[in-house]
């Protein structure tokens, strides 16, 4: 692409023939880590006529058009869209001598955003936010980033998860209540033992529950002690602050076996039933067992 093209790219190569002092100053001023992920500029001489020139490669943080970039480099640069990898361009621009080098190239098989993504994970940024911020890096290294979070960042639960149970007929607004419950992000637990996609969300929803988890597992989920839950390929800490369970049946009818369901009831913090004004706490006399103690 000629330098007068109206295209916008992040990766460019440039040549400045017979560079002046002002050209050197412009290149040095522009090639910094605020503008470039990686930049390398070499001093060369033409093979035929021996013309001195600067040969450079830029991997920019933001797309730039040729005209604007030419101005930033002093106004005399010939520009073209870069081809090949960062490493290929690094080798080409440093074949005679290297005048300037800033940042690090994107190595083959490695995302240049990986260190930043790892730093955000270590700082406690939720893994879903990391995925949104660095989608390509997450696609390539998501499992490793999640493992990093599990090993370094995760904390075990040492609080009582608040358990809210809603009992009502179909179509009475239980799922709507759970959907509108204030939370930055919720995790909807699917039927079965797997917790795929759970990444420490504060609110977990078990919608239309009727006993599809082992009873002892449910008791542990509703408790206050450290708990690791299983996803396909590993385990992670269960750290929900709130658990919302909706059902058409009362908890005492969730399991057919002879369990002591009072152990479940006492872990329930709020037991809500449908009233003319919406869902509200059930009167104590309506409950077969005492809750929240």
Curated annotation (Swiss-Prot):
Gene source species: Goose circovirus (GoCV)
Encoding gene, per UniProt annotation: rep
Assigned EC number: 2.7.7.-, 3.1.21.-, 3.6.1.-
Motif Nuclear localization signal, residue numbers: 3-13, 62-83
SUPFAM superfamilies cross-referenced by the UniProt entry: P-loop containing nucleoside triphosphate hydrolases (SSF52540)
Coiled-coil intervals, chain numbering: none
Recorded superkingdom: Viruses
One Pfam family it belongs to: RNA_helicase
Protein name according to UniProt: Replication-associated protein
Main subcellular localisation: host cell
Gene Ontology cellular-component annotations: host cell nucleus
Family: Belongs to the nanoviruses/circoviruses replication-associated protein family.
Sequence motif: RCR-2, positions: 53-55
